[in-house]
């Protein structure tokens, strides 16, 4: 079983690349953003709670995120592997994911970070916001707040996964096909 964590700042292309990777490697794609949106749309208790944080551009607390994610993994227990998109975002979440996967005799195989310049990403999100209807992609101040949160809370994950020899950085600038090729080269060499 292969379990890959795909991370990068909002707008780095995680969702786009995850679609290609899940097909190519037959993985179950677990996007925390999609899971949040589903729970918010359906007004679940966890969804209502998550929305209060997302509306401010803040990260959703670990306990809420972890409960949502564990539920999705349990629904897909016969999967050949998982592609975690947007999770973990903090060291506490990484430890919780390791503990949860260990309880199922699994582990994170690799983490791959899509890296790109903030200014390029801001423009990507503002363009996406024009057609996606996603409110959090239409406000530059909220976007920059999300990047600040990422730098403070998510960036330390690089050291955590580097220390475990599971971290790979991939250039997230280029065509979709170029980036997919770079990601595939990393995965094929695991």
Swiss-Prot record:
Which reaction is recorded as catalysed by this protein? Answer: AMP + ATP = 2 ADP
Instruction: Report the locations given in the UniProt record.
Output: Cytoplasm
* Binding site residues for ATP: 11-16, 128, 174
A matching Pfam family: ADK
Q: What is its EC number?
A: 2.7.4.3
Q: Which PROSITE patterns match?
A: ADENYLATE_KINASE
Q: Sorted alphabetically, which InterPro entries does this protein's record hold?
A: Adenylat/UMP-CMP_kin, Adenylat_kinase_CS, P-loop_NTPase
MF GO annotations: adenylate kinase activity; ATP binding
Question: Self-association or partners: how does it assemble?
Answer: Monomer.
The written remark on domains in the entry is: Consists of three domains, a large central CORE domain and two small peripheral domains, NMPbind and LID, which undergo movements during catalysis. The LID domain closes over the site of phosphoryl transfer upon ATP binding. Assembling and dissambling the active center during each catalytic cycle provides an effective means to prevent ATP hydrolysis.
Q: What is this protein called?
A: Adenylate kinase
Q: What is the lineage of its organism?
A: Bacteria, Pseudomonadati, Bacteroidota, Flavobacteriia, Flavobacteriales
List the gene name: adk
């Amino acid at each position: 079983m292969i379990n890959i964590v795909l991370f990068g700042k909002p707008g780095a292309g995680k969702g786009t690349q995850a679609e290609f990777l899940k097909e190519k490697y037959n993985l179950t794609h677990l996007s925390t953003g999609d899971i949040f949106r589903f729970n918010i749309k359906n007004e679940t208790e966890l969804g209502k709670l998550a929305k209060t944080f997302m509306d401010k551009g803040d990260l959703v607390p670990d306990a809420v995120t972890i409960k949502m994610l564990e539920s999705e993994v349990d629904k897909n227990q016969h999967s050949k592997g998982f592609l975690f998109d947007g999770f973990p975002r903090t060291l506490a979440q990484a430890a919780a994911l390791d503990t949860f996967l260990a309880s199922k005799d699994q582990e994170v195989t690799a983490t791959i970070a899509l890296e790109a310049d903030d200014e390029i990403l801001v423009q990507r999100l503002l363009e996406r916001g024009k057609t996606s209807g996603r409110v959090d992609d239409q406000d530059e101040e909220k976007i920059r707040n999300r990047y600040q949160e990422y730098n403070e809370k998510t960036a330390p994950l690089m050291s955590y996964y580097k220390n475990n020899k599971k971290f790979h950085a991939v250039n997230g600038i280029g065509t979709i096909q170029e980036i997919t090729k770079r990601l595939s080269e990393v995965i094929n060499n695991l």
